[in-house]
Amino acid sequence: LNRKKLLNDAIQSLKKGINDFSVSRKKLEADYSINVNTREYKESFICNIHQKASTSSSSHMNEYFRNNPDKWREYHSIREENKKEWTEDPINEIAKRLNENKHQVIADLGCGMNQLKTLVNSYSQWYSFDHYSDDETVIKADISDLKEYLQDNSVDAAVFCMSLWGTNYMDYIKESCRYLKRGGIVYIAEPKDKINQSELIGGALGIGFKL
């Protein structure tokens, strides 16, 4: 009788241990799901993507986002949230300038959620590029080489709005010199502490652009 009781007690103790482990695991999973929505997580995620982008080539980032589309979606989702706290969004000023002219051919390089296109008159012909997008009108490409999509001297305005990431970002500028028409314009909007302005301006002037 004692043996049966000891055996039953052992079984009940084992079941309780399994149940406690299951509850603890569920609690851990619940805590994790909450944590990924915290401000700290989002800031860390954005910083990690920026660090990766600033130390990698555009071809590497293109492959990364194509293989990890959820990372692209999460990045731009958080970025759209952050924009609500900005005192000014440069995309609005660029749109204002683009709307001064109709019937342009415009290339938006690193278009993100493709918002700029919605702010500009519908008379213009539009090419939107990014590493990845769920928008079927966006061309998934490495913007350092767009020969497959843009002919020489075919674009009136090229836009780089918060998109000069990558160790080879000057290649984007050089490539724009190829497809821009004579007299075409490049619009660049970047944080002052992100890009070496002297290097950017010197490089642009060196390949034939004027300020």
PLM regions with names:
Residues 170-185:
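A short glycine-rich, Lys/Arg-flanked "PGG" loop and its adjoining helix->strand segment in the class I
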Residues 161-163:
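Short catalytic micro-motifs in class I SAM-dependent methyltransferases
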Residues 193-211:
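Short alpha-helix
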Residues 144-158:
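A short acidic, Gly/Pro-enriched loop at the edge of an enzyme's catalytic core
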Residues 17, 25-101:
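Class I SAM-dependent methyltransferase Rossmann-like catalytic core
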Residues 1-30:
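Terminal intrinsically disordered, low-complexity, charge-rich regions
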Residues 88-92, 96-148:
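Class I SAM-dependent methyltransferase SAM/SAH-binding core
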